[in-house]
């Protein structure tokens, strides 16, 4: 046999491998993230775990939360709705031994799903998911470092010849204990992850690696204590979960309860079922600007790999639509940031349910339509509504009891309160404004009692000058007595310097057709 018949195919194969490695090396992390579009989580399948049941077979784990294993048809349909990335969360703990050796039957199942996703030219994010849960093993940190390295060594070697569409994510939601976060352990294991994957060779040398944030929370990850690993390939992205504000996104429903104050005024306290006021929008603007300044501007793209809202807790559907639309439109409008929807899919077992993967049914047609439009670039772009201003005006469109405003270290000159007064000539009414410094010390209290009692029924502006005090942190406005005689309509803050804000009313009006 001519030796060329043996050598030539080998030469061609090696040449193709080097060509592809060169192609991967030519794309930086931002170019890859920009192609990833919107993402979708195959939640509550391979990531499932149980507090009470023993899991002995892959099928038991995959179906534990009522979802079926991903199929070719399922992935094709998810792609059809506009998603270009599939996050594939995997919990490994039931099918690895004490040294981290993976059982073959589990690796086979994992590989089947990845092959389906990659075949559809979708990006696939593979991770180590609930192994970091408090019932898992990864929570033990440095004690199990060798096991963690061994686990990733096997995963990396299994998939080292896969193309750039496969992305590895180091871990998920770990190392937060009560009010203390173990940055040292996270930094150490993230570095071990990068070193292990890069040293496995093949396409892993240039693969995009997604580095777990500090408990994947934006606040903890943007801290000066958080550090990204050293990577000679310079191909990293940082992982963030966006469940903000907690009270709306993750707050469970509870029966409202009432109480009466000393004046006989009835108050009601209940769950936060609505979202979408100016402060909500400004929170998202502030958070995306924080991601931009902390990571994107420093050469690190951000993958927000979990976004969602509890759908089974009686939250207003319009607010759910609005929240998802705004978050995903922000991520689409910011270079270097992309989002993945967390979808548990099954209403019996899941708590964030948007699309029934088993039966190809969206639970809300507006949400389905909005995702598809955003994927095509046909969405209201938030940056078109950004403004620079020295004023911040907040409509108080809910029952008022106490309102807290955080200045984010901006110097406030005036606080202007617009209120409707009724019957105040005959009652003892106190409107209180407290200002705080960065140490939460009260630096000024304004009692509006004397001024208010001189007013007749009507709508008035009460102006409080705070320009000569240390008013850089926050204020609290509340009515201590006579709340039934006053309706607060609006609060305006005048700042010393201009800042980036949103033309809230115009943006709110622009997206109305997408949420109603």
Walk through the language-model features, giving the residues of each.
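Aromatic-rich peripheral "rim/lid" segments of glycoside hydrolase catalytic domains that contact
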Residues: 313-391, 501-507, 511-515
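Active-site mouth of glycoside hydrolases
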Residues: 26-208, 213-223, 348, 367
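Extracellular carbohydrate recognition and processing domains
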Residues: 396-398, 440-470
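Glycan-recognition and processing domains
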Residues: 382-408, 443-445, 490-516
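Beta-strand acidic-aromatic groove motif in beta-rich domains, primarily in extracellular
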Residues: 424-435
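Active-site region of glycoside hydrolase catalytic domains
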Residues: 146-280, 289-309, 333-337
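Extended extracellular/luminal ectodomain segments enriched in beta-structured repeat modules
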Residues: 408-416, 469-472
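Short beta-strand-plus-loop segments that form exposed binding edges in beta-rich domains
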Residues: 477-484
């Amino acid at each position: 046999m001519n030796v060329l018949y043996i050598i030539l195919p080998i030469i061609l194969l090696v040449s193709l491998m080097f060509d592809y490695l060169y192609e991967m090396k030519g794309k930086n992390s931002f170019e890859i993230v920009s192609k990833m579009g919107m993402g979708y989580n195959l939640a509550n399948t391979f990531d499932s775990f149980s507090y009470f049941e023993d899991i002995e077979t892959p099928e038991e784990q995959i179906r534990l939360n009522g979802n079926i294993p991903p199929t070719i048809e399922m992935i094709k349909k998810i792609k059809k709705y506009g998603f270009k990335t599939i996050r594939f969360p995997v919990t490994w703990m039931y099918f690895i031994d004490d040294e981290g050796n993976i059982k073959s039957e589990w690796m086979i199942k994992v590989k089947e799903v990845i092959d389906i996703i990659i075949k559809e030219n979708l990006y696939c994010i593979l991770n180590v998911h609930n192994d970091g849960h408090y019932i898992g093993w990864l929570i033990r940190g440095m004690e199990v470092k060798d096991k963690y390295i061994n686990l990733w060594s096997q995963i990396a070697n299994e998939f080292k010849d896969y193309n750039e569409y496969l992305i590895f994510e180091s871990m998920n939601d770990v190392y937060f204990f009560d009010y203390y976060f173990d940055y040292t352990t996270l930094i150490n294991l993230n570095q071990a992850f990068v070193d292990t994957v890069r040293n496995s060779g093949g396409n892993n040398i240039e693969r995009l690696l997604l580095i777990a944030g500090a408990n994947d929370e934006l606040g903890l990850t943007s801290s000066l204590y958080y550090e990204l690993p050293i990577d000679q390939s310079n191909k990293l992205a940082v992982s963030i979960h966006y469940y903000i504000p907690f009270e709306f996104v993750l707050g469970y429903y509870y029966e409202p309860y009432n109480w009466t104050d000393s004046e006989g005024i009835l108050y009601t306290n209940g769950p936060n079922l609505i979202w979408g006021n100016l402060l909500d929008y400004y929170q998202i603007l502030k958070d995306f600007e924080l991601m931009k300044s902390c990571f994107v501007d420093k050469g690190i793209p951000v993958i927000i790999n979990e976004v969602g809202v509890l759908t089974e807790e009686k939250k207003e559907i319009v607010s759910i639509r609005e929240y998802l639309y705004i978050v995903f439109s922000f991520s689409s409008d910011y270079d270097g940031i992309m989002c993945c929807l967390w979808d548990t899919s099954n209403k019996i077992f899941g708590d964030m349910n948007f699309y029934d993967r088993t039966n190809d049914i969206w639970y809300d047609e507006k949400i389905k339509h909005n995702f598809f439009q955003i994927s095509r670039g046909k969405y209201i772009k938030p940056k078109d509504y950004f403004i620079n201003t020295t004023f911040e005006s907040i409509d108080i469109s809910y029952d008022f009891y106490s309102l807290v405003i955080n200045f984010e270290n901006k110097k406030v000159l005036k606080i202007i309160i617009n209120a409707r007064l009724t019957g105040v000539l005959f009652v003892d009414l106190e409107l209180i404004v407290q200002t705080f410094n960065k140490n939460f010390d009260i630096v000024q209290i304004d009692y509006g009692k004397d001024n208010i009692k001189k007013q007749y029924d009507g709508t008035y502006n009460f102006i409080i000058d705070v320009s000569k005090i240390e008013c850089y942190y926050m204020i609290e406005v509340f009515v201590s007595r006579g709340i039934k005689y006053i309706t607060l309509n609006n609060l305006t803050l005048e700042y010393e310097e201009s800042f980036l804000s949103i033309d809230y009313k115009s943006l709110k009006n622009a997206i109305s057709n997408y949420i109603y």
